[in-house]
Every structure is written in structure tokens, then in C-alpha cells.
Design a protein with these regions (language model features):
Chain A
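Short hydrophobic alpha-helical segments used for membrane anchoring or interfacial signaling
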Residues: 105-110, 118-119
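Short, solvent-exposed recognition segments
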Residues: 127-197
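Juxtadomain coupling helices with adjacent low-complexity linkers
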Residues: 218-255
Length: 255, 255
DNA sequence: CGGACCGTTCGAATAGCGGGAACAGGCTTT
DNA sequence: AAAGCCTGTTCCCGCTATTCGAACGGTCCG
């Protein structure tokens, strides 16, 4: 498990995914457009596009290529096979019904938080998150709950790798401040997010840990700042959340 | 738009996706396992795996590699950007609430049907379909509804490409029989599925067409055969469905 | 009618992919 | 303990397959 050994990547594969990324970002792109963006010969891009299209990974509409629904198949497969999904999903639905707010299940992967499932109550606001979204762990409640319950060396490594970019002016960007913050989260067992990712939005997040105590994901409740405050925010929601994550942890251990 | 011109695929990219496919199918695989399966040298697989892992597309857990949630990000992106999704989604939810059965939104891509969104009523059975699932168009109600409303040359081409494989003993496998069947669907505007994809499951599907009358997708209602029969199946559900698809078509035209 | 742009095809040169052999480490077996 | 066998990993070399640029054949626009 060598960490950062000098490994030479397969460049052809990289360009293939570069093309996919450009097509994704542009929400459909043409051959010359892609070639210009990536500074490749048109013929090269053409051959790649045709290869990906033959595999069904890109779809050609006229002269523009789009990403195909094969990625949806792959993605849903990943989600369904994840240990947390089956167990956490019903709990997330339950919490959404009880709190009438937006509830998310987030997992950690490669040092970032990934939203794998969300449910909303009747009166919940539409958050800006969506399924599959990747967010730096220090920027939101669920992420901080996860980060606080990782081994120290992993925490430091993640901070080294991604830094502490700000999402709003409330986002924690100072490393020492974050370390203290994480210590507090570790002590009480859950995390708050007060407009640190979206202005006007508060959230509470609690970690889901495995047998050895390491976080593998988290569940969070998010809602408008003027509704999530006072005892509801500091007492009631944490209680609900901890009850849910505790149950999830038990179910995880017996599956 | 040359159809089947002699184009040489980029083989390196193909092997990369072969590896991804093996990892997906095996639900996590090790280097030697993949190498054996694809008859490649261990060193080759290793280099590819490390490349994909560096890009975040594979995740390494110990010595086994898994597909990462990046595919979820790509996949959800594809779905959200699809014209039909935003428009059809609320209608699908509505139909599920009204009928108390499983309702699916299916789109056509590359000649196959892709389930992009599903909603279920309280009493609906769990169908065997899942988001992202790809099904041959002749095998189910939504697919037949789409197939019937494609240009003739596309229909023939799709049948040529994929054949008429059976899912149950009721699946239509005779080409002439299917042609007649499609003609009937075209006349009345919607399709039935009586245990043609899953034994014990019936369904009704209606196409969503664009301005020129070509189907771009379909919506279907599915449920147990003993519940979906008689006038409910032949009158009420088709009415509901046509009302919904009609509305979707109008909304599509004005977006 | 002509120019400018597109996607597409072709051939040729070389960069980089793939393979095999050797290494290091962990686990089981003797 | 130690020998054996299985990993994943690294290295380097040869040959193939990728890349590029130029030329072709469309189509759209002026």
C-alpha cells in the first residue's frame, strides 16, 4: 500500500476521462470544442469520442456528444452496494418525516463527503445539495462529524491534501480553530453548522461509526436558520439524530 | 453521421472500462482476479487500477478495488440534465399517489429503455427494476410504448441490433407479432404488459412524444397481476396515464 | 457562388502501452 | 523456524497502437 510512489499513469485513459469531464462540464460538447479545450488534435478527440460512443458511454445528438445514462447505472450500483445505504435510508426517511426538514446521509470517500441519499419533509427548504455531490469535510455539519471521528493522521492528511477553502464567510478556515472545533464535536458526539456552507442555513450532523469507532459516514438535518435555533437546534435535533445513528450503527454491526 | 464505418477504437480505453466493468460486476475485485478475468498481465491491470484510483474513479480498500461515488456524481448529473426528468418527476409522484402502484419514467437511449425515475404508492410491490436499469424495449410496457412511436427505420434497426430476447414465456419474441402489436399500440396510444417482463406483474405504459411525434420516453404504472386487471387496467389507468403524459408533453414544448 | 467552418479519413512517426521477470511482503504449512 | 506460495509492486525493453497534421467532403452563411 505504497502511498505516493512514483507511478506512471496510463495517459490514454486520462485523456479519455478528460474528454468525459469536458463533455459533462459543458453539458454536451462538439469535437472541435473539446479538442480546443484540451489542446488535442481533432482526430484524436474524434477517435476517443467514437470509442466511448460505441461503448455507449457517450451519446451523439447531431454533432454534440453527451454523457450517457450508463453512468447512472454505474452510480446507482455504487450507492446500492454501499453498506450504509440500505441501513441508513429508512432512518433518513423517518427523520425527515419527524423533523419536517431536509435530511442527508453522507459518506466519506477519498477524504471528501459524498451525499448519497436525501429525504425532505413537507416544509423543508430545497438545499443546494444534490445526490452525488462532493463537499469538503470541514465545510458542513455531516462532514465535520465525520472528520472529528477519523484517526488523527488521516485528519492531518486530508487537511494537507485539500486545504480549508471557504464556502461562506462563516466557514472555518483556520487549522487550529478547526482542531479545537473537532475536539468539541468529539466530546459531545455531534456537529453544528451555522451558515458555514450556505448563508441562511443551519444544520446538525452526527457520525455513523464502525466497530473500531472510526466514522464511515454521517446523517444530518438541515433547515432555515430562523427555524433551526434554540433548544430545537441544541437539544431536540441532536437527541433525534443520535438515536437514529445509534440504531444505524447497531444494524450495521449485525449485517 | 456515418453509421458503421470502419473505425478503430482506442483499445487502451476499452481495457480501462473492461476493468471498471469487472470491478462493478464482482462488486469489488483484486488485481490478479481482474487480470485473470480479462487475460491481461498483472502489471497492466495494476497500472490501470492505479491510474483510475488516482483519478478517484476506483477506491482501494486493502487490496480490493471498488467503483467510487464519482460515478454517482456523473450519473445524477446526466439524469438532472435530461429534458424529461424535471418535467416528468412531479407527474410520476402524482400518479404514484393516485394509483398507489409503482410508477416509472423511462427514456430511450441507444435503442434501449432506461429507468431514470421511479415512485411508489403505499401498497405498491417492489418491482425488480431500479434506477439506471436498462431494458430491451420490446420487453415491457413503457418500452413498447416508446418503440411504437419511433420512425420505422429506427424500429427495424433496433430489432436488428438487439434481437427479441425473452424475459418470461410471455415476452413477445416473434418479429411479425411484435410489428402487429406495435401497430395496435400506435392506434390506441398506450401499451400493456401482461407478465412479459416479470411473472405476476402487469403494467400500462404511455409514450412521451416530442413536437414531431417521435417518442423520447414513456411513463408506466406497474402492479400485481391480480390487482391490475379489468376496467382498471384497460380504462382507468390508461386515462390517468394519457392525462399525465399529455401534460408532460405540453410542459416539454414550453421549456 | 465562394469562403469558412465543421466532422471525418488517412498515413506515418514515435511515444507510451503491455508484458514478463524479478522483488518484497504476508500468510499458511510443514 | 523456515520454506513455500500467494499476494501486490517495480523495472525495463520491444513493439504496437496512439497521436498528430494534413487532406477530404460536407454544410451553413454571407
Amino acid at each position: 500500500m505504497a502511498s505516493d510512489s512514483r507511478h506512471r499513469p496510463v495517459e490514454t485513459v486520462e485523456t479519455a476521462f478528460d474528454i468525459v469531464d469536458v463533455v459533462k462540464a459543458a453539458d454536451g460538447a462538439r469535437i472541435t470544442e473539446i479538442a480546443a479545450e484540451l489542446e488535442l488534435a481533432k482526430s484524436t478527440v474524434h477517435r476517443h469520442a467514437k470509442t466511448l460512443e460505441a461503448r455507449g458511454l457517450l451519446v451523439q445528438e447531431g454533432d454534440t456528444y453527451r454523457i450517457s445514462t450508463w453512468f447512472l447505472d454505474y452510480g446507482i450500483h455504487v450507492r446500492n452496494r454501499h453498506r450504509l445505504y440500505d441501513v441508513a435510508r429508512p432512518k433518513v426517511d423517518e427523520l425527515a418525516a419527524e423533523t419536517d426538514e431536509k435530511v442527508w446521509c453522507v459518506i466519506e470517500e477519498h477524504g471528501v463527503g459524498v451525499h448519497i441519499y436525501g429525504a425532505q419533509g413537507r416544509h423543508s427548504v430545497k438545499t443546494h445539495a444534490r445526490i452525488g455531490q462532493r463537499t469538503h469535510l470541514h465545510q458542513f455539519a455531516a462532514g465535520k462529524a465525520i472528520l472529528a471521528h477519523l484517526p488523527d493522521e488521516r485528519i492531518e492528511r486530508i487537511l494537507d491534501d485539500y486545504g480549508l477553502s471557504a464556502q461562506t464567510d462563516r466557514t472555518i478556515t483556520d487549522r487550529d480553530e478547526l482542531r479545537e472545533h473537532l475536539e468539541t464535536i468529539r466530546e459531545r458526539g455531534y456537529a453544528f453548522n451555522r451558515e458555514e456552507s450556505v448563508i441562511g442555513v443551519h444544520a446538525v450532523g452526527a457520525p455513523v461509526r464502525n466497530e473500531s469507532g472510526t466514522a464511515i459516514g454521517a446523517i444530518s438535518v438541515a433547515g432555515p436558520a430562523n427555524r433551526l435555533r434554540g433548544d430545537l437546534m441544541t437539544e431536540d435535533l441532536p437527541d433525534l439524530l443520535l438515536g437514529a445513528t445509534n440504531e444505524v450503527e447497531v444494524n450495521l454491526a449485525h449485517s
